[in-house]
Amino acid sequence: MTARFPSFRLAAIAGLALAVVACSKGGGSEAGANAVINPVLADVVMGQDSAPVTIVEYASLTCPHCRDFWKQEFPRIKAAYIDTGKVKYMLRELPTPPAELAIAASAVARCTGKDHYYDVVDDVYTNYHKMMDSASSASGAVPVLVEIGGRHGLSVDQVAACVRSKAIQDYVSKEIAEKPDFANSTPTVIINGEHVTDTRYDNLVKVIEAKLNPGAAPAPTTEAAGPAPETTPAAAPASTPAAPPAAPPATP
């Protein structure tokens, strides 16, 4: 069954786009309607395509545990395995509350193209607390998204166009519809098809090494010696929508 965004989410996303334009000193075009964007609508691969091990992470840019994984565990995996050609990595969106903001932040990343996508992901996670704190303020998180987009070459109108892009919304819907059933929280990490529940660095190394050298040693357990890292539940499906957040007011 194809996952669909509830209508209130689409309305909230449209409201975000209007608020983005309101951030422009000149007012901008009608919610970025005339802006030219070329979003990437495919997996963005970090690393060499020929790498023998593939890590897929289902993540959300509003998920605190995803942010912790990206900042604490992932840099060492990148240095040891991705930068050395042994592993390639792909992030797939699985929005968590507030889902509209998660989708909007992902849209900004996708609009910067393959070469800058992960730079924006890192920028969002670097400014995670600022973005999330702003989301509950009167102006909302829109100014933070505009700042992030601007640092990576997007105009205010382009950010607005990205946020309202139906093509991006449809692509994220497709990602959700095609995810494995066990991917119902974030981060969900999959290594060469194996769901790894303990996402701490030492365990990830064991799993990766077992994939790189099959038969060299018994396959490691993916159960944690202690409590497994926490995850964030994915956003509620369309059949059980949560109350939408108040849209940030437009600046007169």
Where are these regions (language model features)?
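C-terminal cap of thioredoxin/glutaredoxin-like
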Residues: 2-6, 26, 30-32, 60, ...
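Sec-dependent signal peptide recognition
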Residues: 6-13
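C-terminal motif of bacterial Sec signal peptides marking the signal peptidase cleavage site
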Residues: 19-22
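A short beta-strand-turn-helix
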Residues: 36-53
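N-terminal post-signal-peptidase region of extra-cytosolic proteins
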Residues: 39-42, 73-76, 175
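Short active-site neighborhood of thiol/selenol oxidoreductases, capturing the structured segment around
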Residues: 49-70, 89-90
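Envelope-exposed proteins and targeting segments
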Residues: 51-54, 85, 104, 185-187
